[in-house]
Amino acid sequence: QIENEYGYFATDSSYLNAMKNIMTEYGITVPFITSEGPYRDSMNAGCIEGALPTGNFGSKTEERFEILKDYTNGGPLMCAEFWVGWFDHWGNGGHMKSNLEENVQDFDRMLELGNVNIYMFQGGTNFGFMNGSNYYDELTPDVTSYDYDAVLTEDGQITEKYRRFREVIAKYKEIPDVKLSMDIKRKSYGRLEIKDKVSLSSTLDKISKPVFSVYTQSMEKLGQNYGYILYHSTLDTEENIERIKLWKANDRANI
């Protein structure tokens, strides 16, 4: 897969082709795909020669596949991300649940008309600061759980969605009769009280090394793909500062 939903963000075929060429140079020989939102603007921006266009969506299968047909040049139709649930964001009021009957109908239609990759087949866990976030009108960070209302739960429990999807698959492919024997015990560990604490500022020299720069450096510039960056700056001026503008300061800023 070359990039992911890049057509939502930019129109830059030279970049996408460069990514494809790098993969080829390093020995990738399997067929290439692009993975886009099935809308004409994003497909026009994200599709390139030599890669099968696929779509990411969770409903309206016929409508989405009809758009894909205009870009696949007779090739196979593929839903690369069939969204069977959604993220849990902090403050969204509880665990997100999809409509099972609609999921089953769309899954059936996808197998009838084309191909599908289930997202997610099994839920996962966002460890540490790897939770990520959506950012449309405002920042909406994900919680630790990435259960996603998936076909199998975060801890591997078999769901009704699993059973219903299995029935759909059996319409198109013979499935062996396998006894489902998972018996996963769950346990509540109660309430854990935190008694000790330490300030971040008192431990900085032990957990990190400073980087000095005239300009603010991004995570990419610093070779960092995880966690946070703590920025410090001293404004040398004898005049009173009445207004400071901070762009996209999503966490904390002390002045």
Residue spans for each PLM region:
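Catalytic-core region of carbohydrate-active enzymes that cleave or remodel glycosidic bonds
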Residues: I22-Y26, N56-T153, Q157, V168-K171
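Short beta->alpha connector loops
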Residues: G37-Y39, F57-T61, D236
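Generic recognition of flexible, low-complexity loop/linker segments
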Residues: R40-S42, R64-L68, Q105-F107, S218-L222, ...
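Active-site neighborhood of glycoside hydrolase catalytic domains
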Residues: Q1-G50
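Acidic/polar loop patches that form or flank catalytic/metal-binding clefts of enzymes
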Residues: I33-T34, G114-M120, I175-S181
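Aromatic-lined ligand-binding clefts that engage carbohydrates, nucleic acids, or primary amines
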Residues: I241-I255
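Extended carbohydrate-recognition surfaces in non-catalytic/accessory domains of CAZymes
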Residues: Y146, Q157, V168-E242
